[in-house]
Amino acid sequence: METVEAGHDDVIGWFEHVSENACKVQSETLRRILELNSGVEYLRKWLGTVDVEKMDDYTLETLFTSLVPIVSHADLDPYIQRIADGETSPLLTQEPITVLSLSSGTTEGRQKYVPFTRHSAQTTLQIFRLSAAYRSRFYPIREGGRILEFIYAGKEFKTLGGLTVGTATTHYYASEEFKTKQETTKSFTCSPQEVISGGDFGQCTYCHLLLGLHYSSQVEFVASAFSYTIVQAFSFFEEIWREICADIKEGNLSSRITLPKMRKAVLALIRPNPSLASHIEEICLELETNLGWFGLISKLWPNAKFISSIMTGSMLPYLNKLRHYAGGLPLVSADYGSTESWIGVNVDPHLPPEDVSFAVIPTFSYFEFIPLYRRQNQSDICIDGDFVEDKPVPLSQVKLGQEYELVLTTFTGLYRYRLGDVVEVTSFHKGTPKLSFIYRRKLILTINIDKNTEKDLQRVVDKASQLLSRSTRAEVVDFTSHADVIARPGHYVIYWEIRGEADDKALEECCREMDTAFVDYGYVVSRRMNSIGPLELRVVERGTFGKVAERCVGKCGGLNQFKTPRCTTNSVMLDILNDSTIKRFRSSAYD
C-alpha cells in the first residue's frame, strides 16, 4: 500500500489562507450566516427588517453585536421546542430543520436539543480531512489501511412533530459524509455499520475488538471520540481476550453477541484463522503474565502509527492508563468541538495532549470571546462565580494568555450562544488564535467562598492516586465529586472507583491527602474555621461508573457523547453513586 498524501496539501493550503485572513474571514462568515437566515423570526425580533446585503461588514458586525443579545440554551429553547413540535415556519434558520442533536446532558443532568443541518455534517467532514492532513505530516499512513475505531451510534427517536433526534455523532455516522470521509482520507473503519449502530455497548465493543484483531496487520491507527472509551474497551479486552481468540480460531462469534444484524454482518467478514489466534494468544499471555498489559496496543497492532481521541479537559485522567496500553505509541489529541459547532483543529499533532491547543477555524462559525478575570474585590459587578466578565470581543481582538468564555453564532440557528467553555489563548496560527481548553464554566466545586475548578480537582485526585499506587497495588479507575451543601457544615464528597485491593488505612491517608491538596485560599480558611466540613471519600463498587454511563446511554445519548462529569449535582447519578458506595472515609486534616 502507498502512503496517503494526495489532497492533504490542498486542504492545508486552504486553512493557511483563511487563518492568515481570519479577521476578514470572520466578517464574511457572519455575513453568510445572516444572509442565509435573513428574515427568520428570531432575527426579526432583534434586527427588524434591516437589509443585510446593503450593509458593509463593519456596520453589520456592529449592528449585530449591539442589538442581538448574548443568550444561553434556555433562551433559545422555546424556539427549538416549537421546531420539535412540528412548526415549519422559519424560526431560527431558513433551511428546514428535520433533525435535532442531543447536546451532552452529563454536566447539568438534562439533555438539550440543538439544530442539526447538512452544514453540521459537512463541517465534520472538513475538520476530519484537515486533521488527517496535519497528522500525515508526522504520522503518514498507508492508503487503504484500516482504523480500529471504537465508535457507537446511539438510539434515535422522533419528536411530537416528527423530527429525528439523536446525538450529533449518531447523525454523522449515518450520513453520506461519514462514507465520504473514509474514501477521502483513504482509511476505513474495521467495523461495519451494523456494529457501529448496534446500540449495545458491550456487544459493539466486543465486535470492534474482534474485527480490529481480524484486520490487525492492516490497522494504521486506533481512535475513538474520547480516551475514556479506548481505556474502557481495553480494560474489557483484558477480561475477554480468550473468548475473542476462540472466535478467531474457529471463525465463529461468541454467544454474547445476540443482535441478529450484528451477528450476520460480523460472521460475513471473518473466517477461521488458527495461526492468527495462536499468535494473539501468545502475545496476550505474555502481556497478562509479565507485563501487566503494558504495550497492549503496540504489540497487538504492530503497524499502528498513533492513537487518536479527545484527550484534553475531563479526559486527562485517562492518559496514564492509555499510555500504559499504548506502550510508547504516540497519543494524538483530536480536535476541539461541541455539539453546537466545531471550533478548532490540532495543527501540532506531535505534541503531548497536555500541551495541545487548537487553531480556531474562522469559517465554521462566528466566534466571540467574553474576557474573564479573577475576582479582586467584593465591589465588582457582573460577577458570575469566580469571574468578572468584560464585554465580548471578536476573534481579531483576543489577547495572548487571556481566559475567555466562547460565544458562537452558527449556521444552524444559534445566535450569540454562550457555549460555557472557558479557554485560554496560548498562541496564534497565522492570524487565528490557538485555544487551550480549561474547563466547563459551571464545573466548579464551591460551598461558600471557596472556588475550585476541574483542574484543581484533577490535581488533587492525581496526588492522592499517586499515594494510593505507592502504598498499595490498587489504582483509581474513575472519579467524580459533589459539593454537599445540604449537610451542616457543607463539604466536598469525592467518589472513587478503584481496581485492586486497598486497606482502610491507605484510603484514609488518600482522603486526608485530597483535603490538604486543595490550596484555594477560600477553601483553606473555611476548613480551618469549620465553615466547610471534612472532605469525604466514598469508594464505590467495581462497575459503578459503567452503570452511570449505561444510564446516560439509555436516555438516547450515544456513548460517544458521554463524559464522566467531574462534578455533579444530578440526582439520578448521585443515587447510583450512593447506592453503590461500599466504604466511606472522612478527612482528619484540620482537626
Swiss-Prot record:
GO molecular function: ligase activity
Top EC class for this record: ligase
Record-level GO cellular component terms: chloroplast
Gene Ontology biological-process entries: response to light stimulus
Keyword Transcription regulation: no
Keywords, comma-separated and alphabetical: Ligase
Domain of life (superkingdom): Eukaryota
Descriptive protein name: Indole-3-acetic acid-amido synthetase GH3.10
Source organism: Arabidopsis thaliana
Organism phylogeny: Eukaryota, Viridiplantae, Streptophyta, Embryophyta, Tracheophyta
